[in-house]
């Protein structure tokens, strides 16, 4: 099966990547990025806005939300001052100006400089742990504080809440140590010491937070502003400066050129969190998890100090072309300093690719396929990996193992390539349409299975959850409409029913963007099920719904600002898969889950969490806070103490996969570790029972 020509949901398409050049506009020293960006969005988006006062007000509100969603920094007076821009942002964008952003940013920096000393003073001495005040955490719309005094009081309450929570957990941890009689190993600290540590942790959290704001340069600020503009068209249209585009490509291909280390920022240092097995760093052997990177040199060139550098900027220095050398000056946990030379290579992130295992249950063997995303390497021009081809390979391997059914796990799979979703769906049916697509002109096209073969015709379950989105929803919806698979999962999938493509912004550069303007991911189409419905907003409702502890909390597309509406189109013509026992199999599964004690507990806990999430008042008195936490613990004790009993017998890696890595212990461990996580997985257990019922009725 070859990859067809249909667009990807979130990747570059050679067919549709349109270059939209500006006319001979005079930029007058303003930022050309904004002109180019709004030109592309206005001409290429599925549902473009006119640059008018209404559009201006949406951008105004979105910028404020991105800068201060929790109303921690701006007062109502600040908003009143900024409101002079509410209906003029559209006029500014037409000439590349960003006066509103600069004004909002200036006020934000003033507020940081006002609030930080107040925080330092407030946390310089023990807090009042006998306070009668409360701190209200709510999901309802927050209001801006009327003045600085009210803002500071809100901060003091927030600081008290944060510190009491940290202090409570330290006291609890210490009590647990006492009960386990480990006090001889771990020194028991007095209350004053614990309180001091809690205050310092709160202070450090705030300082790190403010530091991240202050590290943002003009490019960062304009990139944020550009995304505030694209987001009002819809939440999946985004701007990518050149550096972010590189990260996006990694997420789509599962590959990058670099040293093979996962990095984080800690106290101004770049810290090594993990070494990727089989990578350049792993083979070189000196760089270890826990090392702090102090300097970076390109080959024999002078080293650049990266302490206190933004993590993204440091990563750009460390990454580089395959075959080039980078020299890292690192500080080891024992304090010694080492210079480590590493020759960069292509790093393959194996856990981002499809993988399979065998599950034994009641004397039968079933296949498990995990697919983290619908990845596709379009830039490799036919030589790169595609998720649909990898799934075809996994299916062939499982067929060689003579499995009695297959479950494909799409939980937390946020989507990816539309082309691969179409081709992958076609692996399970002989022929027919997979998805319908509507463009801005309202023209509807059907995307068919590209061949008449069926790679796997046996029992099939698709496992989903709320974070199965986009391409995942296309595959699940198509196989549900054909009645080819039984869909099992939480009450619905994410609800993203739109198609995006990456469009390069017109060539050029500016002092702020010396490497060029990057690209914009633009929504250009909506997709629809073959039954005429759409997954937009409401997702795919499983045939067998499994209770989830977050059922009472709204999630997914419908909770996102500026989402596109739900609608329908006429159904396509298609023939149902022949499975006369499907309805009975689904009915049996529903009855089984309704009787399941574990799912009854989950439903009960979901109701409790929903009440807490909507609004909760925390006591700012330490004794009162302890009582509240005790009550919360007692509420879910029944859930925490429940001993889940797995249903499946065993799960293990395919012999052919283990044979490939028999001489590499790290890669062998990788092949085995991911399977262990499924050994107490209620979703997998129910899926396997459905497959068993299905296989018994063939």
Question: Where do the language-model regions lie?
Answer:
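Acidic/histidine-rich, surface-exposed loop or edge segments in extracytoplasmic proteins
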Residues: 34-46, 84-88, 204-208, 372-375, ...
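Extended, domain-scale alpha-helical bundle/helix-rich regions
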Residues: 120-258, 262, 267
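Bacterial Sec-dependent signal peptides at the C-terminal "C-region" and cleavage site
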Residues: 4-30
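Charged, amphipathic alpha-helical regulatory modules used
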Residues: 24-130
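PDZ/PDZ-like domain segments forming the peptide/carboxylate-binding groove
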Residues: 66, 87, 106, 110-117, ...
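Conserved functional hotspot residues or short segments at active or partner-binding sites
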Residues: 122, 145, 153, 168-184, ...
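Polar, glycine-rich mid-to-C-terminal structural blocks
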Residues: 471, 483, 490-555
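Cleft-lining beta-strand/loop regions that shape enzyme active-site pockets
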Residues: 22-25, 42-52, 211-220, 234-258, ...
């Amino acid at each position: 099966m070859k990859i067809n020509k249909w667009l990807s949901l979130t990747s570059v398409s050679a067919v549709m990547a349109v270059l939209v050049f500006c006319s001979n506009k005079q930029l007058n020293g303003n930022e050309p990025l904004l002109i180019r960006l709004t030109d592309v969005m206005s001409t290429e988006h599925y549902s473009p806005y006119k640059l008018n006062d209404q559009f201006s007000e949406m951008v105004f509100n979105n910028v404020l939300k991105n800068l201060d969603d929790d109303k921690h920094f701006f007062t109502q007076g600040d908003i009143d001052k900024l409101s002079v821009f509410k209906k003029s942002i559209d006029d500014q964008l037409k000439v590349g100006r960003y006066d509103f952003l600069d004004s909002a940013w200036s006020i934000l920096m003033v507020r940081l400089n006002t609030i930080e000393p107040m925080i330092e003073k407030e946390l310089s001495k023990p807090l009042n742990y006998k306070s009668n005040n409360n701190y209200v955490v709510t999901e309802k719309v927050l209001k801006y504080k009327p003045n600085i005094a009210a803002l500071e009081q809100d901060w003091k309450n927030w600081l008290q809440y944060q510190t009491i929570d940290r202090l409570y957990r330290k006291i609890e941890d210490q009590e647990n140590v006492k009960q386990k009689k480990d006090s001889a190993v771990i020194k028991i600290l007095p209350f004053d010491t614990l309180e001091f540590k809690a205050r310092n942790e709160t202070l450090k959290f705030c300082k790190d937070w403010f530091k991240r704001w202050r590290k943002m340069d003009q490019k960062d600020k304009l990139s944020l502003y550009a995304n505030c503009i694209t987001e009002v068209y819809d939440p999946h249209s985004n701007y990518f400066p050149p550096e972010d585009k590189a990260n996006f490509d990694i997420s789509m291909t599962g590959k990058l050129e670099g040293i093979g280390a996962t990095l984080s920022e800690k106290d101004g240092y770049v810290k090594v969190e993990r070494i990727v097995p089989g990578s350049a760093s792993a083979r070189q052997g000196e760089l270890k998890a826990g090392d702090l990177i102090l300097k970076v040199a390109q080959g024999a060139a002078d080293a650049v100090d990266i302490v206190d550098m933004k993590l993204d900027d440091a990563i750009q220095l460390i990454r580089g072309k395959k075959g080039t050398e980078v020299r890292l000056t690192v500080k080891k946990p024992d304090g010694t300093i080492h210079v480590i030379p590493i020759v960069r290579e292509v790093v393959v992130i194996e856990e981002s690719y499809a993988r399979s295992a065998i599950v034994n249950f009641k004397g039968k063997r079933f296949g498990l396929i995990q697919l983290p995303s619908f990845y596709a390497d379009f830039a490799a021009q036919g030589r790169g990996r595609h998720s649909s081809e990898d799934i075809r390979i996994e299916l062939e391997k499982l067929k060689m193992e003579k499995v009695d059914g297959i479950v494909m796990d799409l939980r937390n799979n946020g989507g990816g390539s539309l082309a691969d979703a179409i081709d992958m769906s076609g692996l399970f049916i002989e022929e027919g349409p997979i998805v319908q697509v509507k463009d801005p002109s309202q023209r509807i096209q059907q995307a068919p299975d590209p061949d008449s073969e069926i790679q796997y015709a046996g029992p099939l379950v698709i496992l989903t959850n709320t974070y199965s989105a986009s391409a995942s929803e296309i595959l699940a919806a198509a196989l549900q409409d054909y009645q080819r698979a039984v869909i099992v999962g939480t009450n619905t999938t994410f609800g993203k029913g739109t198609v995006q493509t990456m469009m390069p912004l017109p060539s050029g550069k500016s002092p702020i963007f010396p490497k060029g303007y990057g690209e914009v991911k633009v929504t250009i189409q909506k997709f629809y099920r073959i039954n005429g419905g759409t997954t937009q907003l409401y997702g795919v409702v499983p045939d067998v719904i499994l209770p989830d502890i977050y059922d009472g909390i709204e999630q997914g597309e419908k909770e996102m600002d500026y989402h596109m509406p739900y609608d329908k189109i006429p159904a396509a013509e298609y023939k149902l898969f022949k499975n006369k026992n499907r309805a009975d199999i689904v009915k049996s599964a529903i009855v089984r889950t309704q009787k399941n004690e574990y799912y009854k507990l989950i439903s009960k806990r979901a109701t409790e969490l929903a009440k807490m999430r909507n609004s909760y008042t925390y006591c700012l008195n330490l004794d009162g806070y302890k009582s509240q936490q005790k009550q919360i613990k007692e509420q879910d004790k029944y859930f925490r103490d429940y001993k889940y009993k797995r249903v499946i017998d065993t799960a293990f890696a395919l012999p052919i996969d283990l044979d490939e890595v028999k001489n590499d212990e790290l890669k062998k461990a990788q092949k085995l570790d991911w399977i262990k996580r499924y050994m107490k997985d209620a979703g997998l257990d129910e899926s396997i029972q459905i497959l068993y019922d299905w296989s018994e009725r063939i």
